């Protein structure tokens, strides 16, 4: 998303690679989606490691299986990049392969 806002228009990402955050990324954004996205004020960039830690945190503390895209919001909040003060992270969806989820959260404390 940050690259879209920098470009000011939909762009194609040649170097995109798939990850467990499949609901929040892809090779491009549909042109029909740009009018819905363009009014947003910006985006927050988080790493895959930060998202994985956020998914584990949600599983441990809230007992919720969160997919990668939902983990992005929690990662932004827990890293402090979402701003100061109280932050609400909406965690929706559990569309993640169970084996992948287990590999992210681990099996031990």
Where would I find each of the regions flagged by the language model?
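PLP-dependent amino-acid enzyme catalytic core
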Residues: 1-109
């Amino acid at each position: 998303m940050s690259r879209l806002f920098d470009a000011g228009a939909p762009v194609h990402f040649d170097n995109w690679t798939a990850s467990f955050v499949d609901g929040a990324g892809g090779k491009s954004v549909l042109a029909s989606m740009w009018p819905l996205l363009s009014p947003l004020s910006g985006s927050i960039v988080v790493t895959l490691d930060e998202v994985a830690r956020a998914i584990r945190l949600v599983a441990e503390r809230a007992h919720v299986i969160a997919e990668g895209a939902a983990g992005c919001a929690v990662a932004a909040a827990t890293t402090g990049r979402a701003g100061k003060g109280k932050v609400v992270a909406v965690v929706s969806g559990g569309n993640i392969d169970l084996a992948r989820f287990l590999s992210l959260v681990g099996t031990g404390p």
